[in-house]
Regions:
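Cleavable N-terminal signal peptides
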Residues: 8-9, 19
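Bilobed "Venus flytrap"/periplasmic-binding protein-like clamshell domains
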Residues: 22-56, 119-187, 198-201, 325-330
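An extracytoplasmic/periplasmic, membrane-proximal ligand-sensing/linker region
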Residues: 25, 39, 197-211, 215-223, ...
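Ligand-binding clefts/hinges and TM-proximal coupling segments of bilobed small-molecule sensing domains
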Residues: 133, 138-157, 235-284, 288-311
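Sec/Tat signal peptide C-region and signal peptidase I cleavage site
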Residues: 15-21
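N-terminal segment of the mature folded domain
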Residues: 71-115
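Bacterial N-terminal signal peptides that target proteins for export
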Residues: 1-7
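Pocket-lining segment of extracytoplasmic ligand-binding domains
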Residues: 82-83, 91-93, 99-102, 127-129, ...
């Protein structure tokens, strides 16, 4: 009788473990050569390795839609620039049609597993275009992102901050989906590009096959000015300075700056889930992320060691700067079990 009971318990445990290991989750992210793309793909790898879940990842998505899909329970995980929950909560920009009540309701359904710097917005052009930098935007055609979403919102804001120009009045904007970005950069559709960048950036590296590129830093006076400081206070935006020598380019790229630093607005975000995700699942996913930081996440692409994965300091995560979403309780448990401190304002 004792033997039968023991065997029964073992069988039950095995079935429970098997069911947990075979959990299938869905995830949406940006292009696979971007920080959000690599990050979510890495999560699928560490989740499988830890036998937490099988995550089916769809890349090349517009994250505006992906974040809403998570809030509505249509997708389990999405990469989310933190500006998007802010826009959703206010029902403005790409979420204007939701209405404030619906937007606030959807935002209340979002929670964070971990954060990272998605990109630093910047201006660049092929040397062959004879483009003159920030002072030369007027009257030009600028590729500034996909048809809707955080990248386009941030690009328009950055151009207005630097030049005072608005799309359609001072310059012509070109938008295409991320899957067509490299082609659009290379085919001459635009004079210059104001896009999210990693260091080194995959799109720029691919574009070098068509010629040398120049990147323009934000002018120091603009970076230190009152207007930019206001922009830096927008949830999901942090000021970034980086030594040009650490940007990761070995040739074909010139960086224009008054000194040896690149300056720009950084976009931070993270992997979001629905608040209704099981506590143990959120904890297991976050634990798998923490355990895979060095051998998976930071080793996955040249720009990943530069992307602030594994940070919990709110100066880098921007979790409490008007950000309407918090960490999932399961994620908090995983972080704290691993010895990290999560600020109370982010719980």
């Amino acid at each position: 009788m004792k033997l039968k009971t023991t065997l029964g318990l073992v069988a039950s445990a095995c079935l429970a473990f098997s069911a947990h290991a075979q959990t299938i989750l869905t995830a949406e992210t940006a292009a696979p050569n971007t920080a959000p793309g690599v990050s979510v793909i890495s999560l699928s790898e560490v989740a499988a390795r830890s036998e937490v879940a099988d995550i089916q990842v769809t890349t090349g998505q517009t994250l505006t839609n992906s974040v809403q899909n998570v809030a509505e329970g249509k997708t389990d995980i999405a990469a989310a620039p933190f500006i998007l929950p802010v826009l959703m909560s206010r029902a403005v920009g790409p979420y204007a049609k939701l209405g404030k009540e619906k937007g606030a309701e959807l935002v209340s359904k979002l929670a964070v597993l971990y954060t990272y710097r998605i990109s630093v917005q910047g201006l660049y052009a092929f040397d062959s275009s004879n483009f003159g930098g920030w002072d030369d935007v007027a009257g030009k055609t600028i590729f500034n992102g996909p048809p809707r979403g955080a990248a386009l919102t941030n690009a328009r804001l950055l151009i207005k901050l630097n030049t005072g120009l608005e799309e359609g009045k001072g310059y012509t904007g070109v938008q295409v989906n991320w899957g067509q970005a490299v082609k659009t950069i290379q085919d001459g559709s635009a004079d210059a590009f104001v896009l999210p960048m990693a260091f080194p950036d995959g799109r720029i590296t691919a574009a070098l096959a068509s010629g040398d590129v120049t990147i323009w830093s934000l002018p120091k006076t603009v970076y230190e000015g009152e207007a930019f400081q206001k922009v830096a206070k927008i949830a999901g935006t942090v000021p970034v300075t980086l030594p040009i020598a650490d940007m990761g380019y070995s040739g074909g790229v010139t960086v224009v700056s008054e000194d040896d630093l690149y300056r720009g607005p950084g976009t931070v975000g993270g992997e979001v889930v629905n608040v209704d995700m099981d506590f143990d699942m959120a904890k297991a996913l976050t634990r798998a992320f923490i355990e895979g930081l060095d051998d998976v996440y930071r080793a996955k692409a040249p720009f990943m060691p530069n992307a602030w994965h594994g940070e919990t300091d709110i100066a880098l995560t921007d979790m409490c700067n008007g950000n309407p979403i918090k960490y999932h309780p399961g994620a908090v448990a995983a972080w704290e079990d691993a010895g990290y401190m999560i600020p109370d304002c982010a719980k």
